[in-house]
């Protein structure tokens, strides 16, 4: 048995940390030189390295949201390092009471128990509208 967490387990830790809004441990899920791209963000964004990810995840603590991940489906691929995860963040803006559902598809490569690259296809506009 491998001493490293599986891609599926690492993904689960990621969405658990995001939905609980506990950002402190999230950067440690990533390799030092990890690259995360958000192709559907306006403008598209690219985060390189743990420091950039730490800054990105720190925003979770200030967001006025309660949310959960639902309809989670993780697909294994022919490459044992790569998974495709489909899911939704569903929640509520605690300041406005506005409900939201944000569909996501993450294509994630996990090597030695850490995310080395991820393409996160999220409906950023739906989240931005919920925060307005």
Task: Annotate each predicted stretch with a short phrase.
Residues 30-31, 89-91, 106, 122:
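Short beta-strand segments enriched in hydrophobic/aromatic residues
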Residues 62-63, 90-99:
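Short, cysteine-centered beta-strand-loop-beta hairpins and adjacent loop/turn segments enriched
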Residues 1-28, 32, 132:
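Short, low-complexity N-terminal intrinsically disordered segments enriched in polar/charged residues
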Residues 79-89:
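A short hydrophobic beta-strand element
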Residues 4, 25-78:
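A solvent-exposed, acidic/Ser-Thr-rich amphipathic alpha-helical stretch
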Residues 68-69, 100-105:
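Short, surface-exposed coil-to-beta transition loops
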Residues 117-132:
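Low-complexity, intrinsically disordered terminal/linker segments enriched in charged
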Residues 14, 26-27, 34, 49, ...:
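Hydrophobic pocket/interface hotspot
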């Amino acid at each position: 048995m491998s001493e490293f967490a599986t891609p599926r387990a690492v993904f689960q830790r990621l969405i658990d940390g995001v939905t609980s809004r506990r950002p402190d441990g999230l950067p440690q899920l990533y390799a030092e030189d990890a690259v995360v791209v958000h192709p559907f963000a306006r403008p598209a964004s690219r985060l390189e390295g743990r420091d950039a990810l730490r800054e990105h995840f720190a925003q979770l603590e200030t967001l006025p949201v309660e949310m959960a991940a639902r309809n989670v489906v993780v697909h294994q691929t022919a490459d044992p390092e790569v998974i495709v995860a489909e899911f939704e963040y569903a929640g509520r803006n605690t300041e406005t009471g506005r409900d939201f559902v944000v569909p996501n598809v993450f294509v994630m490569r996990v090597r030695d128990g850490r995310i080395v690259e991820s393409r996160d296809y999220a409906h950023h506009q739906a989240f931005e509208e919920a925060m307005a």
